[in-house]
Amino acid sequence: MSLKYHQLDSSVEKQIKENISKGILSSYRFMDENAVRRNMEKDKNSVLRPSFGRDIEKILHLPLYNRYNDKTQVFSFYNNDDITRRGLHVQLVSRISRNIGRMLGLNLDLIESIALGHDVGHTPFGHAGERYLSELLQKETGRHFNHNVHSIRVLDILYRRNISLQTLDGILCHNGEFELNEYRPQKGLTFEQYDNNVELCYTEGGEAIKKLVPSTLEGCVVRICDILAYIGKDRQDAITAKILSDDSIFSSEFIGSKNAEMINNLTVILKRGMMFETKILKNSIIYFIVATQVRKLANPLFMR
């Protein structure tokens, strides 16, 4: 099926162009000067190095960032450089998120820092490795292992990079595996609340994680774009790995079947209902795509 790429309404596109040309930003954008760190005497915001730009650089120069390169996204044991690895996935999340964030007038550095760091604690062998480690940890300690929690542990405890609360929270709350009908930022987060959320993730596992909502709209955008980045690419990789013969079973009149169609059309659908809002509503079409089509069709074929 050949699907026409959706376009933004002309009035919406005109408004976005005007806002960008005039430098108009969203009133819901999280400002660099409001970043919170455990050590507020270090890593202060400046013109040369804005707060969240610092977070980006800290993550990029982290030794564990290099380990993205050969970590499994979905398919392990394939000697094929055309199959997506974790390193490409985080770049795709960053690119899609920043594109949406630019149209919304949000903080692109905060979006990028969350996106680049969101899987830095992910396991080898993808979610299969994550489940296995969690089983071992529960057997020995009664606690749960989850990659989002380990990602912030890497940044905040193992390497102690003084990453901002807003970046850490966005990473902790990023899990695209748990969809919500509404993404409304939980404003006013403190490190005390954040630390409590982390502990609940260890003790309650998925039950606690699925209740998490980012404290910034930037974090909400990244969380949704984590889904957008993999729902088409994972299927494309399944064809490359010859697990699927073609993508016809994913055909949809709403979003198409190919990765490029999905990213474009989901971005347009999302943008139509997101302009300068305090929340992101996942409308019935998005819910159908993510909660029904992807889960129902993909899970019998392979596990993420």
Regions picked out by a protein language model, each given a short descriptive name:
Residues 1-86, 92-100, 108, 144-150, ...:
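Histidine-centered, transition-metal-coordinating active-site segments
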Residues 104:
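Basic, low-complexity intrinsically disordered segments
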Residues 109, 113, 124-143, 240-244:
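Post-HEXXH active-site segment of zinc metalloproteases
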Residues 117-125, 229:
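Short active-site segment of divalent metal-dependent hydrolases/proteases
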